[in-house]
């Protein structure tokens, strides 16, 4: 009923404001710095120009220029929050998170945008106090101001936001006591503010002169005794830390102790799982433990370089996938939360969405949506999937990876590409997982000789000398995936009974091509069924991806376009529209 009432009010007042919304965006763009040209699609030939398909803009409907939502996160925009927003009167959701906005939060923001339901200004450089006038956003459900430079106390007026379900003020410079009515938002909503006290953080204390004298005296006596004990314990901690390399918490480096990691999780079973979208029912760590049968080996979906994934069947009938990262996180807690929040906002039809995470000491669990048909690797090795389905998978996976390289903001290298990170949903559409994890985990595996010498089969040959991941390295890995699709073979250690040799897939295919026996390299389950010309086209695309010189490999977007032409012949992907607005003048810049 509340949603209907908001909608009804906006409909009544909005018919005359379509031109105002155009002026709103024009003013917004002109008042900001946009160094990476994220808003280059924002052009306004006249006051009636359609704005509903501009980057980050969503409208109530496509036929009128009334803005429902502005989603402009992670675009490197800088400047103060523009006053022109007051012309977007129908706006319900404003997300300017993880940019470089500075200055004060406008005290008039809720009189400008009275129908806001979601306001996310997190991850900027905003300063000053939280305006008490935010109480005028009477429909506000979610308020995120974390990771800024806000000072002062938390205004008591926030307690009057009756619809507020999510509040995050963490990682600022706020001080004073937390209003008791806000304590139910949990510690995560307030941590990282050294001057804050009160539930759910530590209690606020007040000391008179007598109490202070007692505390200081006791502190001095205790300090002398502690110094003696501490000096003796120093050596024990020093030796232990050299052995374990700081194996607690964030920033841990080399730290995993696999002896009883499940026991560690059980001892923290009441820890809440952080979810990026507000759930109907909150999930705790114990729910994941039970849903995976105690992380039983029978629930393993796939084991990859980034970690082991487990199928989690929840009591309500829904299914998730829980990944335990194999390496520790070298980031600080603030850096980790910044990176994980960015990953949690990424949505694309060919990517597996990251739904949430849970951290217990050095253990990091990631929660993803479950894909019904498993991995591409398992499908190729265990089942007979026909050629049209393989084309569908190849195009979808290429689309997802190309979007990470050329359409996502910020851009992402994958670094873990393989047929085990390409999952298949119930319609056999490809969904890429494990993107962005290279920024979270220890770089130890990139220094491991078995990684650099190509043992895993997907690692580009130049990595053995440069030790630096690159976009062209992702293209090489995807080329191996295409070879798997065409040949049905594994990426490494092929054992051909007839000729008795073991080689990498690239070497095996190259030998067949150089001997004029390309047909012998094709999977017999798909050869001779009317698609041989298409199969050879994909083989040529694959070979272009795995050339030894990185600069001679195509861009991922070029690989996608080549494969999409094949998909169009099968009528699979006519609904795909242009989603790569960036223009690249120098291919070398991307490699």
From Swiss-Prot:
Keywords: ATP-binding, Glycoprotein, Kinase, Leucine-rich repeat, Membrane, Nucleotide-binding, Phosphoprotein, Receptor, Repeat, Serine/threonine-protein kinase, Signal, Transferase, Transmembrane, Transmembrane helix. Glycans are attached at residues 46, 211. Its EC number is 2.7.11.1. Its main location: membrane. One of its GO terms (molecular function) is protein serine kinase activity. The modification Phosphothreonine is found at residues 292, 389, 466. Residues 1-18 form the signal peptide. Residues 295-573 form the Protein kinase domain. InterPro entries: Kinase-like_dom_sf (IPR011009), Leu-rich_rpt (IPR001611), LRR_dom_sf (IPR032675), LRR_N_plant-typ (IPR013210), PRK1-6/SRF4-like (IPR046959), Prot_kinase_dom (IPR000719), Ser-Thr/Tyr_kinase_cat_dom (IPR001245). It catalyses: L-seryl-[protein] + ATP = O-phospho-L-seryl-[protein] + ADP + H(+); L-threonyl-[protein] + ATP = O-phospho-L-threonyl-[protein] + ADP + H(+). PROSITE patterns: PROTEIN_KINASE_DOM. Residues 240-591 are cytoplasmic. Disulfide bonds: none annotated. GO terms for cellular component: membrane. The modification Phosphoserine is found at residues 378, 465, 470. This is Probable LRR receptor-like serine/threonine-protein kinase At1g69990.
């Amino acid at each position: 009923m509340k949603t209907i009432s908001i909608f009804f009010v906006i409909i009544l007042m909005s018919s005359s404001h379509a031109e105002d919304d155009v002026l709103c965006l024009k003013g917004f763009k002109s008042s900001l710095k946009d160094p990476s040209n994220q808003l280059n699609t924002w052009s306004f030939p006249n006051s009636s120009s359609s704005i509903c398909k501009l980057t980050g803009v969503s409208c109530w409907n496509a036929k009128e220029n009334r803005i429902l939502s502005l989603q402009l996160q992670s675009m490197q925009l800088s400047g103060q929050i523009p006053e022109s927003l007051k012309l977007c009167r129908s706006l319900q959701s404003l997300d300017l998170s993880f940019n470089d906005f500075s200055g004060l939060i406008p005290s008039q923001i809720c009189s400008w945008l009275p129908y806001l339901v979601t306001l996310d200004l997190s991850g900027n450089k905003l300063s000053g106090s939280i305006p008490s006038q935010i109480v005028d956003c009477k429909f506000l459900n979610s308020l995120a101001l974390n990771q800024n430079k806000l000072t002062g106390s938390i205004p008591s007026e926030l307690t009057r936001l009756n619809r507020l379900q999510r509040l995050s003020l963490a990682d600022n410079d706020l001080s004073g006591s937390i209003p008791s009515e806000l304590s139910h938002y949990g510690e995560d909503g307030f941590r990282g503010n050294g001057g804050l006290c009160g539930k759910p953080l530590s209690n606020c204390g007040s000391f008179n002169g007598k109490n202070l004298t007692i505390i200081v005296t006791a502190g001095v006596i205790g300090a002398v005794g502690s110094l003696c004990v501490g000096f003796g314990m120093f050596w024990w901690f020093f030796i232990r830390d050299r052995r374990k390399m700081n194996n607690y918490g964030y920033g841990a480096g080399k730290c995993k102790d696999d002896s009883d990691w499940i026991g560690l999780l059980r001892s923290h079973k009441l820890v809440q799982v952080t979810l990026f979208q507000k759930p109907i029912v909150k999930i705790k760590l114990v729910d994941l433990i039970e849903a995976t049968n105690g992380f039983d080996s029978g629930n393993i979906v796939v084991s990859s370089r980034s970690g082991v994934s487990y199928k989690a069947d929840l009591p309500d009938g829904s299914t998730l996938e829980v990944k335990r990262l194999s390496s520790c996180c070298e980031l600080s807690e603030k850096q980790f939360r910044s990176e994980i929040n960015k990953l949690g906002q990424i949505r694309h039809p060919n990517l597996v969405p990251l739904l949430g995470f849970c951290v217990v000491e050095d253990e990091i669990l990631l929660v993803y949506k479950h894909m019904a048909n498993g991995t591409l690797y398992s499908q190729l090795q265990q089942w007979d999937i026909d050629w049209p389905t393989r084309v569908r998978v190849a195009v979808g996976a290429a689309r997802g990876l190309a979007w990470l390289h050329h359409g996502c903001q910020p851009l992402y290298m994958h670094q873990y590409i393989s047929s085990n990170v390409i999952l298949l949903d119930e319609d056999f559409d490809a969904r890429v997982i494990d993107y962005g994890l290279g920024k979270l985990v220890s770089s130890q595996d990139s220094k491991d000789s078995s990684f650099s010498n190509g043992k895993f089969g997907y690692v580009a040959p130049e990595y053995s000398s440069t030790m630096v991941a690159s976009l062209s390295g992702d293209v090489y890995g995807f080329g191996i995936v295409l070879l798997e699709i065409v040949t049905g073979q594994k990426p490494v250690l092929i054992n051909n009974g007839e000729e008795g040799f073991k080689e990498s897939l690239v070497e095996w295919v190259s030998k067949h091509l150089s001997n004029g026996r390309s047909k012998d390299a094709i999977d017999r389950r798909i050869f001779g069924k009317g698609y041989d010309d298409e199969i050879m086209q994909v083989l040529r695309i694959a070979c272009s991806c795995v050339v030894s010189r990185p600069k001679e490999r195509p861009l991922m977007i070029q690989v996608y376009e080549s494969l999409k032409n094949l998909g169009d012949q099968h009528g699979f992907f006519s609904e795909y529209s242009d989603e790569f607005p960036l223009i690249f003048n120098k291919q070398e810049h991307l490699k």
